[in-house]
A protein has these predicted regions:
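Helix-boundary and loop/linker segments of multi-pass membrane transporters
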Residues: 24, 117-123, 155-159
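Transmembrane alpha-helix/helix-exit interface in multi-pass inner-membrane proteins
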Residues: 87, 91-110, 136, 140, ...
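Membrane-interface interhelical connector segments
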Residues: 103-127
Length: 175
C-alpha cells in the first residue's frame, strides 16, 4: 500500500511542479521541467516497484508529465513550443548521457567509496537512454502532431477552436 501512496503523491507533486513552473516562468518553466523529467526518468527507469497489482518502473510517472507539458504548450503556446519541449528533453538527455559516461573515464582516488556504485547505476545508461529517447521522440512528436490534427478537425467540424479540449488531450496522448 505504501508504493501506491508514494506513486499518487509523486504524480500530484510532479504535475503540480509542472503547473507551478508554467505559472511562474511560462514556457521556460515547462522546458525546464521537461528537461529534468527526461533525465530523471531515465535514472528512475532502473527502479522496479510493485504498485496497483503490477510491476512498473518509477520512470513512468516522470515520462507521463512530459505529455502534460506538450499538451499545455500545444494548447497555450502553439505546436512549435510543444515540439521545442520535446527537443529540449532530448538535448538534455544526450547532454546527461555524455557527461555521465565521462565520469567512468576518471581514475578515482584510493579514498573513493562511491565510484563502484556510480558505475553500477550508470553502466546501463547509454543503452537505456538511447532506447528511451527513441521511443520518447517518436511518441511525443506524434502526440503533438495528433493533438493539432484533432484541434483542426474539431475547429472545422464545430467552428470553435477552444471546444473539445478533452478530445485533443485524450485523443492524442494514449495513442
Amino acid at each position: 500500500m505504501i508504493n501506491e501512496l508514494l506513486l499518487i503523491f509523486s504524480v500530484v507533486f510532479i504535475y503540480g511542479m509542472a503547473l507551478l513552473g508554467y505559472a511562474l516562468f511560462g514556457k521556460a518553466g515547462l522546458y525546464c521541467i521537461s528537461a529534468v523529467a527526461t533525465i530523471l526518468a531515465n535514472i528512475e527507469a532502473l527502479i522496479l516497484v510493485n504498485a496497483f497489482s503490477m510491476e512498473q518502473t518509477l520512470g513512468n510517472v516522470l515520462f507521463a508529465v512530459t505529455f502534460l507539458i506538450t499538451d499545455i504548450l500545444s494548447e497555450c503556446e502553439g505546436k512549435k513550443a510543444a515540439n521545442k519541449a520535446v527537443l529540449t528533453g532530448i538535448l538534455s538527455s544526450v547532454f546527461f548521457l555524455v557527461l555521465s559516461q565521462s565520469w567512468m573515464l576518471y581514475n578515482p582516488s584510493p579514498n573513493d567509496t562511491i565510484m563502484p556504485s556510480i558505475k553500477a547505476v550508470f553502466s546501463n545508461t547509454p543503452r537505456m537512454i538511447f532506447a528511451s529517447l527513441t521511443v520518447y521522440a517518436i511518441s511525443q512528436l506524434f502526440d503533438v502532431w495528433l493533438y493539432h490534427k484533432w484541434w483542426k478537425f474539431t475547429e472545422k467540424k464545430f467552428g470553435d477552436k477552444r471546444r473539445f479540449l478533452w478530445l485533443r488531450n485524450n485523443g492524442s496522448t494514449p495513442v
